């Protein structure tokens, strides 16, 4: 019997295989087998991973998309990131904003945090609201 210590590197991928050479069954006095470990990562966050990039979806209102907004993201690093939209520049539905350096890290490389904005439109507008929008736009 031997206790095996598995080196899990930062940023390891789901389904990645770690091979520990000659740590498996003894075939004969000169030959030992390998131990293969398959990594199974269970995501319990609101982020989705794509390589080194992290993806996050943010729903905003029509008003926020037109007038600007800000919000805080609780990042997996434990840091809180504040996102401020650009005032005067409408945020389009489906826009993806990449923030370099806030993705996963592996072997000195860092991915991006990619925020996709989805706009929630009102179910109905009153005649008065429609007139105001027409007047403004």
Regions found by a protein language model. Give the residues of each.
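Intrinsically disordered, low-complexity linker/assembly segments
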Residues: 1-137
């Amino acid at each position: 019997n031997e206790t095996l210590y598995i080196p899990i590197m930062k940023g390891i991928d789901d389904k990645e295989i770690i091979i520990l050479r000659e740590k498996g069954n003894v075939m004969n006095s000169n030959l030992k087998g390998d131990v293969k470990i398959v990594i199974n990562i269970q995501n319990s966050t609101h982020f989705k991973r794509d390589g080194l990039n992290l993806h996050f979806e943010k729903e905003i209102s029509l008003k926020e998309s037109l007038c600007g907004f800000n919000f805080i993201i609780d990042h997996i690093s434990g840091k809180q990131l504040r996102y401020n939209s650009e005032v005067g520049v409408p945020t389009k539905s489906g826009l993806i904003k990449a923030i370099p350096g806030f993705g996963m890290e592996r072997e000195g490389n860092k991915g991006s945090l990619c925020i996709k904005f989805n706009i929630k439109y009102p179910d109905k507008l009153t005649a008065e609201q429609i007139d105001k929008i027409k007047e403004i736009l």
